[in-house]
A protein has these predicted regions:
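Aromatic-lined carbohydrate-binding/catalytic grooves of carbohydrate-active enzymes
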Residues: 113-139, 161
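Short hydrophobic alpha-helical segments enriched in small aliphatic residues
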Residues: 18-21
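Aromatic- and Gly/Pro-rich amphipathic surface segment
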Residues: 77-109, 113
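Short, positively charged and aromatic/hydrophobic N-terminal segments
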Residues: 14, 25-32, 37
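Active-site region of glycoside hydrolase catalytic domains
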Residues: 38-87, 131, 140-381, 385-472
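Catalytic domains of carbohydrate-active enzymes, especially glycoside hydrolases
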Residues: 102-123, 300, 304
């Protein structure tokens, strides 16, 4: 049962309640009371069967620093070690999933599970560990991995920078300093021509678009130019489609009848999303506290929309960072920690993709972090259903990459479990596909959702385990 339907009947229910009980109740309180009694998730057993378009591309995604291990020359590795010095309990990436040494096993498992595409990143810190010193040995490693993916019939999405960068580059100010674009150009000119024959889709950068502080606004402003320059360099060596992965969060005013919350809802959308879409379509870059810029080099520097989307963020205009508390009655506790992705909100798929009707769309990240794998199956059913609705409304959605193929290092902890495949860190990094991996495999084989597939893997709707201790 989705809230959009509930709200339509709320007025009738409220009128009936007040008439027959002769009690006057605040309408917003009434809504909250009712919604707390509603299931937090759709009854997925009521979803009708549906198919995806022919040649729809199915797969999964990872990021180098989160799965490879021993990324010792990166800024992330350095920051982890510095944090560990002051907090002995801090979890560092370490060996991560040991994907660097186990990529052949992982590729064969991808093939076994039916994946036809795989998104991975090139770790710049491995390729250029010191300024101006390039490692052909490390580049050869990525060439072997990409070649092995292609040999096994798996299309590749390659991200040139997925957050982590060489420590020396970070010390120079990374993407916050436009003067550093020459180092990025040099890196791309070294790597791209050597790997281009193995790449089907390119992501220049990953998720540089979020944040509202002045520092983040400056970072985003400059990153658009890094993206555009990367696009033009890659085009010199490859005719495959290019984009940058965009974190498309739906912003939602906490009080929808409050002019301040709704205004800041739209403001957050502009500074985190529309600024990029507008720049790609027109060449005009507009962000607060910066003079607008028109640069023809920016225009049309995406061949497709590469979209990472998970849920919504609540906006509260009365908070200095505009971050509102999520509604308690929509949270789904699936981990022994407070986690920002504790709400299922598939509406964000339909809402967000319908603003991207001018180019093909690939969802390059979407996933659920949970200990009870049944939640992941429900999540997939809900979000795939929303994708189907978006396609029916005219969105040219051509592919879906689940995040993540493996349980991995989530930047500061191993507690979140996004993976279709479990990794036993205490037992030689043994890989064990979860039931959701086989559910997803049958979705891929069927090129669509069916109740027959669902009922094979899900017997009942999962319930929140309130006994899970909060570790952090």
């Amino acid at each position: 049962m989705r809230y959009s339907f509930i709200y339509k009947v709320m007025g009738l229910c409220y009128n009936y309640f007040t008439k027959h009980t002769q009690r006057i109740v605040n309408y917003n309180i009434f809504i909250k009371i009712v919604l707390m009694k509603v299931k937090r998730m759709t009854d997925v057993f009521s979803i009708q069967d549906f198919k995806f378009p022919t040649n729809f591309l199915w797969g999964s995604a990872v990021a180098g620093h989160q799965v490879e291990g021993n990324n010792i020359h990166s800024n992330n590795w350095y920051n982890e070690q510095q944090t560990l010095k002051v907090n002995p309990n801090y979890e560092v990436s370490g060996m991560a999933c040991n994907h660097y040494n186990m990529y052949r096993e992982d590729v064969l498992l991808l093939k076994e599970l039916g994946h036809r595409a795989f998104r991975l990143s090139i770790e710049w810190a491995r390729i250029e560990p010191e300024e101006g010193r390039f490692s052909q040995t490390e580049l050869d490693h990525y060439i072997r991995e990409l070649a092995f993916l292609k040999e096994n019939g798996i299309q590749t999405f390659v991200t040139m920078v997925h957050f982590s960068v060489p420590l020396w580059f970070a010390k120079k100010g990374d993407f916050s300093n436009l003067e550093n674009i020459k180092y990025f150009e040099r890196f791309l000119n070294y790597v791209v021509p050597k790997i281009s024959r193995y790449v089907d889709f390119w992501n220049v950068l990953n998720e540089f678009n979020l944040g509202s502080t002045q520092q983040k606004l400056d970072f985003k402003f400059n990153s658009v130019f890094f993206h555009a320059r990367g696009y033009h360099i890659i085009k010199q060596y490859s005719d495959k489609p290019i984009s940058s992965a965009h974190a498309l969060v739906q912003y939602y005013g906490r009080r929808q009848n409050d002019v301040f919350d709704v205004t800041m809802q739209h403001y957050n959308d502009i500074i985190n999303h529309e600024f990029f879409f507008h720049a790609m379509r027109t060449g005009e870059l507009v962000l607060p506290h910066k003079d607008g810029v028109f640069d023809k080099e920016l225009k049309n520097t995406v061949d497709f929309w590469s979209i990472n989307l998970y849920t919504r963020d609540i906006v509260d205009a009365r908070k200095k960072d505009f971050r509102g508390e999520r509604y308690d009655f929509t949270k789904t506790r699936m981990l022994p920690m407070n986690f920002y992705l504790d709400e299922f909100y598939p509406e964000c798929v339909y809402h967000n993709l319908n603003r991207l009707l001018d180019k093909p769309v690939y969802i390059t990240e979407n996933g659920c972090s949970c200990y009870d794998d049944d939640f992941r199956i429900v999540y997939l059913a809900e979000y795939l259903s929303a994708m189907n609705e978006a396609i029916k409304s005219g969105v040219d959605l051509r592919g879906y990459l689940y995040w993540s193929f493996l349980d991995n290092y989530e930047w500061s902890t191993y507690i979140p479990k996004f993976g279709l495949v479990e990794v036993d860190y205490e037992n030689s990094f043994k890989r064990t596909p979860k039931p959701s991996a086989y559910f997803y495999k049958e979705i891929i084989e069927n090129n669509g959702f069916s109740q027959k597939i669902l009922k094979k893997y899900l017997k009942n709707m999962p319930r929140v385990d309130t006994s899970l201790p909060i570790i952090i």
